[in-house]
Each structure stands twice: as C-alpha cells, then as structure tokens.
From Swiss-Prot:
The active site is at residues 199, 229. It is found in: Membrane. It comes from Aspergillus versicolor. Its EC number is 1.14.13.-. The chain crosses the membrane at residues 11-31. The lineage of its organism: Eukaryota, Fungi, Dikarya, Ascomycota, Pezizomycotina. Its main location: membrane. Glycans are attached at residue 75. Belongs to the paxM FAD-dependent monooxygenase family. GO terms for molecular function: FAD binding; monooxygenase activity. It is a single-pass membrane protein. This is Notoamide E oxidase notB'.
C-alpha cells in the first residue's frame, strides 16, 4: 500500500512511509495491533520471542465489543478467522449448582452482535497470525528484545544484537512483561489471590469409550455445549468445541500450589480437581470426563491480580504498553482478550487522528480513553470471582448469586471504534492542557455491576 486511503469516520490514512510501529509480543493484543496499524497504512514490525504463535489455553470468548472490530477486516467477512474447527457452536450457556440443578440457561447465538464467539485459543492465535502474514505484515518470531529506547523523534528496541528503529513502540508482551517497568516506571508485584486454576482441551476420542461421559457428546452432531458448575470454593466449566471434536474443561479452586514456579502455567494431573468433586452430588458426572484427560493436557496456575498501573506511556511519549502488559485480568469476567483487542483498535485510531508529527499525543490519548475502562473491568473481574466461588445460590440478595455478574451490557455492547472517533478531541485537549478527562465508556456510578446490566 503506497497511496493514501480515506476513512469515512476520520481523515486520510497516511502512507506506510509516514509511520513505523514496532510491536513487541504477538499474542492477541500484538497481532490485533499489527493488523489495525497496517489497515491504517503504517509500516509494522512485529517481534515475538517464541518460535511461533502457539499459546497454551483452552477456550476464549470474544464478545461483541471485540468481534465488531474483527468484523471490519477482510471487507466485512469473518471467514478468514472463523471455521468449525476453532469455534464452539453452542446454543446456550448453562449454569448449575453443585447438585447438578440448572439455575440459568442463557441463549447463545454467535451471530448476535453483542455475544460474539467462543474459540479454541490456539486456533484463534493461529488464524490471527495467518491473516497478518497474508497481509504482508513483517512478523519476526524467535526474537528476544533486550532493551527499549526513545528520543524526541524516534523509538525502538535492541533485539538479537540489532537496533530496530521506528516512530513508536507498542509493548504487548503479556502478564510477565519485561517492557512494563522500562516504559511505565512501574512493575507492581502481582498478588496471589488464593485461587488455583486448571484448564485443559483434548481430542474427544479420549472419552469415546466412557459411557458415563457420553452426556458431554450426545448432541455434538448438532451443537456444542458449555456448562458451568458453581459450588463453595470451586467452580468447574466443561464443554465441547468444533461440534464435539474437542472436550475442554476448566476449574478454579480456592487454595494454593505447594510449589512456586517461574513459568505462569505448569503441566499437572487433574487429581486435585477429582478430589474436590468427590463431595459434589454431581461430581461423578463431571469426573467421568475430566478423569480421562490425557497426560500433558492439563495445566495449572496460581491466579494473581495485578493492580492498575498509574500510566501506560513512557516519559518521552513514544512507547506504550497494551493488553496484559498494561492491565492483566482475572479470568472471571471473560474480558482479557476483548480488552486487548479494544486497545489495539483505539491505538490505530489515535495514531491516525493525531498524525505522524504527534505520536506522543496519540499514545497519551490511548491511555486517557482506555485506562479507567479497563481498570473498572479489572476490579469487576475480582468481584465476579468472589461471587462465583462463594456460590451463594440461596441468597436473598441477587448481587451475591453467581448469576449476578454475567454479561454486563456496558462492557459487551461498547463500540470502542465509534467512541474513539467521537472522544479523541476531548481527550487530546485534556492531554495538551493538563485537564482531567471524564471517561464516557464506563457507568456514571463507577461500578462494574449494574442492577439491570445483564444482557
């Protein structure tokens, strides 16, 4: 792309020679940022220390607030990202108590512009990487970034004994970000919240000869399932993907790992979960599938919360952290990937609207538009986790039940693209004049859970 394009919601999109964006970390945040910046006409250099785009995980949900961004790609077609092998074709999200009584069935339709899709995480990352490569974006794997630098006019990194120069650096290097401390001057110690998470996804053939587990697959030819069970101090989600080709399950249980590990996720047998389920009336039903998890297919991690950073942008204004590097989430709100994608879209828009001579302004406006929204969702995710693990199904207070935090409308229905175009000038004025900026993408009362907020 060498000529200017136009955007009906903004000014002319500049040629790639006008701006070079270096992106460190090619997970969901980094790959989406690479694609969004490429769509604006910028030159993108993507760097990833791993040899490929594979990432551990089971199922990730991309709700309407992020899917509407991806839907703008490829002339409005999602065919390049979505196929039967990487999605869960569910018709309802079903919630149960520990006795197996269904408490809620939320109709689910992937074509609903608010609800979005459930993906196999590895499949989604592979699709994003493939699409970025098809666009001709310069993605470099197996590259270790050693340091970051900026001047008044440029920013860049030192990687594999090479100095790489651009107009700005976007660090999307995840929860264990090396860039965070360098760019923001902050590197807060994550707090262990006393919960251990387990997750797995494996070929459904592993349970094909287990009669007690066939309930998981009985409707697989027509639809996948997604069941969540909430008991005191333990929650379990189990279901299928790709029309029954895969079984996935995840569990969060209050407690602590006996050993501390440097890696954030460790292979582990499912035995601790099977032990927890022994006291559940519905436990044997769930254990029938979980017990057949193949060796090496279950992973455990201690859940740790990271407090909101005071700032995301470097002192010189040419480097920024996004995604988990800026605001990691506990898994309960299901918004980690979604907010990373929102970050990426807003980044591209702010660079476009600020212009190439105002890169520091662009990055600081990104922070203004995004910081309070993601900070509130971080807080709400912790509140949701307490509700899920308390499992107060019989409480007279609706706010205490596990159903209280499902699908908050202000989160899922948000259009960050329209919002960024509408609010850019107000946020830019706040940055330039040192004014307070009042965000319009969070509830006025500043609370995550809204009384009538569920979709």
């Amino acid at each position: 792309m060498t000529k200017s394009q136009t955007n009906p919601r903004g000014p002319a999109i500049l040629s790639p020679a006008d701006l070079t964006v270096i992106i460190v970390g090619l997970g969901i945040a980094g790959l989406t940022a690479a694609i969004e910046c490429h769509r604006k006409g910028y030159t993108v250099i993507g760097l990833e220390k791993k040899p490929d785009a594979n990432q551990l995980g089971d199922i990730i949900g991309l709700s309407g607030n992020s899917m509407r961004i991806l839907a703008e790609w490829n002339n409005g077609s999602l065919a390049h990202l979505i196929d039967d092998d990487i999605t869960c074709d569910v018709t309802a999200l079903e919630l149960f108590d520990a006795e197996g009584h269904r408490k809620l069935a939320m109709p689910y339709n992937a074509n609903n512009p608010i609800q979005g899709y459930l993906f196999r995480r590895t499949g989604l990352l592979t699709s994003l990487c493939h699409y970025a490569s098809q666009l001709g974006i310069d993605l470099r794997f197996g590259v270790t970034v050693d340091d970051y630098w900026e001047t008044d006019s440029n920013a860049g990194v030192y990687a594999n004994n090479e100095k790489i120069t651009g107009d700005c650096v976007v660090a999307a290097d995840g929860f264990h970000s090396k860039a965070r401390g360098i760019i923001t001057g902050e590197n807060p110690e994550p707090k262990d919240i006393g919960v251990v998470a387990y997750r797995s996804i494996f070929d459904a053939n592993a349970i094909a000869d287990v009669p007690e587990a066939q309930w998981i697959l009985k409707n697989a030819q027509t639809a996948d399932i997604f069941h969540s069970y909430y008991g005191k101090d333990t929650m379990v989600a189990i279901g299928t993907a790709a029309r029954g080709r895969y079984v996935h399950w995840g569990c969060a249980v209050r407690g602590a790992l006996e050993e501390k590990y440097e890696a954030w996720m460790q292979p582990a047998p499912p035995d601790p979960i099977l032990k927890c389920l022994e006291s559940w009336p519905v436990g044997s039903k769930l254990a029938a599938g979980i017990a057949r998890t193949p060796p090496g297919k279950c992973f455990q991690q201690s859940l740790r919360a990271m407090p909101p950073l005071k700032r995301w942008v470097s002192t010189g204004g040419r480097m920024i952290v996004i995604g988990d590097a800026a605001h990691s989430f506990l898994p309960y709100a299901g918004q980690g990937g979604n907010q990373a994608i929102e970050d990426a879209a807003v980044l591209g828009i702010c660079l476009e609207l600020a212009g190439t001579s105002n890169v520091p302004l662009a990055l600081r406006v990104v922070e203004k538009l995004r910081h309070k929204r993601v900070s509130l969702i971080q807080k709400g995710s912790a509140e949701a986790g307490d509700s899920f693990l308390n499992a107060a199904w019989e409480s007279d207070n609706a706010a205490e039940k596990p159903t209280a935090f499902t699908h908050q409308a202000w989160v899922y229905a948000h259009n960050c693209v329209d919002h960024a175009y509408e609010q850019f000038n107000a946020a830019a004025e706040a940055v330039m004049n040192g004014w307070e900026y009042t965000p319009t993408n969070i509830p006025a009362n500043g609370k995550f859970r809204q009384e009538e907020g569920n979709i």
